[in-house]
Every structure is written in C-alpha cells, then in structure tokens.
Amino acid sequence: MRLLFVLLCCLAGAAHAEPARTPPPKAYLTLIIDDLGQNLPRDRRVLALPGPVTTAIMPDTPHATEFAREAHRAGKIVILHMPMDPATGPYAWHPELPLEELQKRLDAAFKMVPYTAGINNHMGSRMTAQPVAMAWLMGELQRRHKFFVDSRTSAQTVAAQQAQKIDLASVSRDVFLDDERTEAAIFNQLQTAISLARKQGSAVMIGHPYPQTLAVLERELPKLKAQGIEWIDIKQMISVRSNKATPAHGKNGIYR
C-alpha cells in the first residue's frame, strides 16, 4: 500500500512538471567596417575589436596595401571597398564607362588591396542601379572566386539581384550603424540590428572607423554573447542566409 502511495505521488509530480523549454532561435550578427586604409593608428583599433570584424579597405587610400596585410595577419577577412559613382577617383566606377574600363579599374583596385575575399560598394547609388554593369561584375567575381556584399546605398540597387541570378555568394546590408555620428545614435542602431537579428535570424551591420562608432563597439560587442547573439564572420553569414533575400529586400527569398 505504501509503495502504491509513493508511485501515485511520483506520477502526480510528473503531471505538474514544467514542459522542457525549447531553446530560443539562433540570432546572428556580422559586422563590416568600411573606409579603411586612410589612418593606420585609427584603423588598428578595428583590428583590436573582440570578434570577426570584416575589414573593407578602399584602394585609393595611402595605407590600403599595408593595412590589408595587417588585417590578414590579424586573422580578419579583407574585402575591397570598391568606389562607385558618385564616388570619384582613379578606381571609381561610373555608368558611362565601357566595360573594358570598368575591368581595368577593378583589376587595379584588387592589386592595391591584397588578400581580398570579396568586395562591397563604396557609395554607388547610381552604379549599383545599372543591370548590365552589375551583371558583368557578378560574373567577374564568380570567375575570381570572390563574394559580393551589397551595401544597399540606394533602394534602386540591382546588385544583389544580379548576384542571386548566377548563384554568386552574396549578402546584403541591413543596418548602417553611424549615419548619425553620436554614441547615443550608434548604440540605438546597434540595438536595432540586435532586434532585427532576433526577428529574422540574422542582421548585417556596416559601420565606419569613427571614434564614436569604435567607442560603442568596444564597449558593447563583448556583451553580445550574454544577450544570446552570435557574432559570426561574413562568410558564415553568407552561408546562414544561403543567398536568400530578407523580407526587407525581397519576397520569398528572391531579391526585388
């Protein structure tokens, strides 16, 4: 009788036990810092950030080659921050240039920035809206085994769309951290990226090596893990997204 009573108590306890909690869905962030190569002491703060930051280096800067080598030695992913119209300079792409000149400028830019795994556009609101040039670029990057990051400096961009058409490894930016250059605004943008990552599973951030941006990142990035956020590098993010557009950039995974 006593044994029966004990068994009944155990069964009653099991009936009221809390159900096993399902782990929260994964939330991934990746970070690109643009406009590098201009100021070595400043840019080295980017290399000291505690995680897999992607370094986007401009070819027409005084320290482009040297900093690319430093970033590579530091284990950071290096990408070419390719100037595009309305950017100016000897490497900049403009819609009126023939494809032969675009290739010449791209070749020269890659020579200035060694160890590149891919590229993203610097400015480029006019250039990334050009279907023919963007289709050519994506084919060229595929030939070179490099990926593309669409900075989405314009709502009219067709760059990621053209990359997706040929299944080139690519991803699009979700959040600019520092359009407003104050620590409070940058912190808020970081929180926006974190919220977006929780909502859609991932978020791609782009920032710049401004003192305010670096101060916020140095303070807040070490806290990501405790917030349930996994900071991954850009190659991992491309894999996570599988070349699919997020709802903000397309429909049913297809870029519009």
Question: What does each model-identified segment do?
Answer:
Residues 5, 16-256:
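Catalytic-site microenvironment of enzymes
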Residues 3-12:
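Sec-dependent N-terminal signal peptides
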